[in-house]
Amino acid sequence: MVLDGVRKALSRFLSGKGDYERAVKEFIRDLQKELIKADVNVKLVLELTKKIRERALKEEPPPGITRREWFVNIVYEELSKFFGGDKKPDIKPKKKPWVMLLVGLQGSGKTTTAAKLAYYYKLEGYRVGLVAADTYRPAAYDQLKQLGEQIGVPVYGEPDNKDAVEIARRGVEYFVSRGFDIVIVDTAGRHHREEDLLREMREIAENIKPDEVVLVIDAAIGQQAHDLAKKFHEATPIGSIIVTKLDGTAKGGGALSAVAVTGATIKFIGTGEKIDELEVFRPPRFVARILGIGDLEGLIEKVRRIKVEFTEKDVEEFLSGRLNMRLVYKQLVSLRKMGPLRKILQMIPGLSLKIPLEIEAGKAEEKIKKWLAIINSMTYEELDKPEIIDRRRIRRIAYGAGVKPEDVRELLKQYEMMKKLSKQLRKRRDLLEKLQLGFKP
């Protein structure tokens, strides 16, 4: 995840018991190191940490909150402002049909992002069409066509036509005439200079009259995103930005902060290669995950959109420590549909600080299938009270599930770990409620 070191530094700060001012100084040094490593502009880093230091040493915490706890709130607020503030991007189309023109430099992940965007809006209930107007890159049409088939979204393209403007115009007309709600136009990303990119953007825009122009930026370019975002923001009043590949680069923080300082709107961020790994960018929620505070609202939203049997009540039960194997089974089935376990667990307040190493390494998904089989071999009594499972029961369960007794013991160990973690989260939830973080929309 972007800026993983910040979360670890904050964890050390909270667990420390020495001099407060010295601890603040050490955390700020760690924060500066992590931000600069993420290619954030040094001047911006120094301005940010100066504000945090001044507030940390001057402000008195409200009654009932320690200075270290209040410091978490200060860091949260200042980082949220740093990445764009608490304004929510307007992602709903203002009318139908709504035409979106995607532009971006070569290698920014634009075609994949077009499909992710189409999938996102399809899950929101819109009829979406994709237009393949990238006539420069070989197999661009085939790639978008394949992605469209994967997500059940139609794709318009003319593989033998090299006129991108004409294809874009015809594609928009095709979907609009058939009553589609949203039309997403993918274009070529062959330009390495901002001026060339913006010139072609204007040419296509003049012909298809888009309602929104979306600039796709690769997070790997770091603070270089500033100039591109600034010129784009000045060139079109209807523009928004998607920052991609945040999971695959250490420079994601630099790219996000560089765009935010221009005043341009970041609507979405790409957090992985899978088609559903595109999320609305809301700085407070993003920062909450960086700090290990979690993003319960984001988790519930993901559950709602994917329509899994994993409710807000289930999340609350886990966080309250009321756990049994029935709930574990339900969670495992749901989590399989929601993507990598590590990313889901990072959304649970406080849990990202204590994610088991095997989940960090991405190996847990391989074991879920085996764990489900083990749970299916348990009796009703064992499901409700896993604590009664002894050596004899372990052998019986393993035989019924077709696994080794060690596999059953491993699941029971994970269950105990989850119970322990959920109890530890109670204290952190109390802190979050005091600070009014993490659980407010």
From Swiss-Prot:
The keyword GTP-binding applies. GTP binds at residues 104-111, 186-190, 244-247. GO terms for cellular component: signal recognition particle. GO terms for biological process: SRP-dependent cotranslational protein targeting to membrane. SUPFAM superfamilies: Domain of the SRP/SRP receptor G-proteins, P-loop containing nucleoside triphosphate hydrolases, Signal peptide-binding domain. It comes from the Archaea. It is found in: Cytoplasm. Its EC number is 3.6.5.4. Keywords: Cytoplasm, GTP-binding, Hydrolase, Nucleotide-binding, Ribonucleoprotein, RNA-binding, Signal recognition particle. The keyword Cytoplasm applies. It catalyses: GTP + H2O = GDP + phosphate + H(+). GO terms for molecular function: 7S RNA binding; ATP hydrolysis activity; GTP binding; GTPase activity. Involved in targeting and insertion of nascent membrane proteins into the cytoplasmic membrane. Binds to the hydrophobic signal sequence of the ribosome-nascent chain (RNC) as it emerges from the ribosomes. The SRP-RNC complex is then targeted to the cytoplasmic membrane where it interacts with the SRP receptor FtsY. Composed of three domains: the N-terminal N domain, which is responsible for interactions with the ribosome, the central G domain, which binds GTP, and the C-terminal M domain, which binds the RNA and the signal sequence of the RNC. Belongs to the GTP-binding SRP family. SRP54 subfamily. Part of the signal recognition particle protein translocation system, which is composed of SRP and FtsY. Archaeal SRP consists of a 7S RNA molecule of 300 nucleotides and two protein subunits: SRP54 and SRP19. PANTHER family: SIGNAL RECOGNITION PARTICLE 54K PROTEIN SRP54 (PTHR11564), SIGNAL RECOGNITION PARTICLE SUBUNIT SRP54 (PTHR11564:SF5). This is Signal recognition particle 54 kDa protein.
